[in-house]
Amino acid sequence: MTRQSLWDLSETDVEDGEIRINVGGFKRRLRSHTLLRFPETRLGRLLLCHSREAILELCDDYDDVQREFYFDRNPELFPYVLHFYHTGKLHVMAELCVFSFSQEIEYWGINEFFIDSCCSYSYHGRKVEPEQEKWDEQSDQESTTSSFDEILAFYNDASKFDGQPLGNFRRQLWLALDNPGYSVLSRVFSVLSILVVLGSIITMCLNSLPDFQIPDSQGNPGEDPRFEIVEHFGIAWFTFELVARFAVAPDFLKFFKNALNLIDLMSIVPFYITLVVNLVVESSPTLANLGRVAQVLRLMRIFRILKLARHSTGLRSLGATLKYSYKEVGLLLLYLSVGISIFSVVAYTIEKEENEGLATIPACWWWATVSMTTVGYGDVVPGTTAGKLTASACILAGILVVVLPITLIFNKFSHFYRRQKQLESAMRSCDFGDGMKEVPSVNLRDYYAHKVKSLMASLTNMSRSSPSELSLDDSLH
């Protein structure tokens, strides 16, 4: 077809002109005015071409005699395209992959904006699901790899006892002390450690009550001797626990690089520093101000509660979540900072002349902080109508700001909790019997690595299987 005849078809014979469309063998006659309703689409631009070269840039082939345009595309989807030209609404082909459908409509020059409301929600939901599944799969893969590395390091540490004096005995003690749930001995030791930690915390809390305080010779409140006995027993237990772990550690240099061991150290150091300070103050009254240091150090006993992280999967998962969620936590703090800055200035502008509690912007920062976090102490409240409306908006904004990043943090917590449970299950399945030493010409580390990799793969598959699949597997075996 010449340039003039095609242009005449689209300009002078718009009402009656027809063109033939062949999409993978699916043929249809279409009126030109139907296609020109959407001139930005591929078929609409086809009618506005001025040369054969321009036509062939938009279609795969063109028959001058039949005036037929050929497209080597999916013929099953083209009826949906035709329906769009007739009604202006695009429906989604459910049988086709959502990304293939997206590529097809992009080829035809149809924007996703034209997808009808009945299909829009499911279409965009199906596009998001693969991204979420990809993130979950990547997280599971990273979890398995990280867990495998940790267990491999665990096996490597255990193998260091081979050839050492009392190596097998020290290894069993190390497993019992460092891995709660590994054996009956480790469970008993774990329960005793938890009871001592809780007893120490409860004693510290009860000691703050006036009914349990005994005045000294100067009338100052002092500790009950019974509580001091409990405190000294707790310190003795914590010291024994730390020294025992250090004595049976496979690598003394790496011992204090472990965060849990640092927590154990910090739980007893304040007591010994306080003991030294008290001795110095008693021997030299001029250094009485050092007694304040001892009082501050005594408050650090509350951090002993962190020792429970060694015995709690949830606490360790929480620590890992906070470690790897710094972006989400930073995002949460950023949202709160922006909201606090905005609402504090608004409250200051409205309430500065009516309310002494909101007479300065720093004072308004405090009010905006407790309002956005929905704490609401009630110590400072706006008095004007405009101030109350501002407070309502501040509270609603705080709810939205806190909820958005919390979902991401919760997903990561679930991920790390599942990983930690798999890690503990794998460690409880470890076997350090003499059977390993009976295998000659096999590298112990490689054997451990192969065994752990198989174990982690099976645990990951089990976590992905549904209950029905698990029951079916059990019935087959």
UniProtKB/Swiss-Prot annotation:
It comes from the Eukaryota. The keyword Translocase does not apply. The chain crosses the membrane at residues 185-206, 226-248, 260-280, 291-311, 327-348, 389-417. SUPFAM superfamilies: POZ domain, Voltage-gated potassium channels. It is found in: Cell membrane. Residues 207-225, 281-290, 349-361, 382-388 are extracellular. GO terms for cellular component: membrane; perinuclear region of cytoplasm; plasma membrane; voltage-gated potassium channel complex. Its main location: membrane. Detected in brain, lung and in pulmonary arteries. Keywords: Cell membrane, Ion channel, Ion transport, Membrane, Potassium, Potassium channel, Potassium transport, Transmembrane, Transmembrane helix, Transport, Voltage-gated channel. Residues 1-184, 249-259, 312-326, 418-477 are cytoplasmic. Potassium channel regulatory subunit that modulate the delayed rectifier voltage-gated potassium channel activity of KCNB1 and KCNB2 by altering their kinetics, expression levels, and shifting the half-inactivation potential to more polarized values. While it does not form functional channels on its own, it can form functional heterotetrameric channels with KCNB1 and KCNB2. Each regulatory subunit has unique regulatory properties that can lead to extensive inhibition, significant changes in kinetics, and/or substantial shifts in the voltage dependencies of the inactivation process. SMART domains: BTB. It holds the Pfam family BTB_2. One of its GO terms (biological process) is regulation of potassium ion transmembrane transport. A motif (Selectivity filter) lies at residues 374-379. This is Delayed-rectifier potassium channel regulatory subunit KCNS2. It is a multi-pass membrane protein. Residues 362-373, 374-381 dip into the membrane without crossing it. GO terms for molecular function: potassium channel regulator activity; voltage-gated potassium channel activity. The keyword Disulfide bond does not apply. Heterotetramer with KCNB1 and KCNB2. Does not form homomultimers. InterPro entries: BTB/POZ_dom, Ion_trans_dom, K_chnl_volt-dep_Kv, K_chnl_volt-dep_Kv5/Kv9, SKP1/BTB/POZ_sf, T1-type_BTB, VG_K_chnl, Volt_channel_dom_sf.
